[in-house]
Structures are given as structure tokens and as C-alpha cells.
């Protein structure tokens, strides 16, 4: 069951981080700098290859995401639907 949540977070975060990067009009390299990570790691996040860690999520919410509460509410909804699909 935990794997479902991890996959949901990976997809959700990938979509959000890519959306905000495009909205800000910055490159993957610039986003990597803002999130204090390597370009390769950021590229993997942006493309849904890997999931974010706690520090990356915290940096995203505090430095990039304009509405962290809305982001977390949407993530909660995604997790809630994950619960329904695994029952």
C-alpha cells in the first residue's frame, strides 16, 4: 500500500514542479539551483523518474509554491483517492 502513496506523490510532485517551472519561465538548471539539488536530480523529478525527498518538498513549499496550503490540500485529495483505489 505504501508503494501506491509513493507513486502518487512522485506523479503529483512531478506535475506540480514542472507546472511551476514553466509558470516562472525558468530552466531546469535554475529550478535545480532553487531547490539546492543537482540538475540531473531535478530532471528526474521534473520527468517523473524519481520522487522528492523531505528537504526538496520543504524547499519547494517555502520558496517556490505560491500557495502551500492549496498544494497540500490537493496532495491530500490525491492520497485520499489512492486509499479508495487500494481498498
Where do the PLM segments sit?
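A short, Lys/Arg-rich alpha-helix, primarily the initiator
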Residues: 1-23
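Short alpha-helical DNA-recognition segment
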Residues: 25-43
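DNA major-groove recognition helix of helix-turn-helix/homeodomain DNA-binding modules
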Residues: 55-73
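Residues that mark the N-terminal boundary/hinge immediately upstream of a DNA-recognition element
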Residues: 16, 27, 53-56
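Short, charged recognition helix plus adjacent turn
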Residues: 2, 70-87
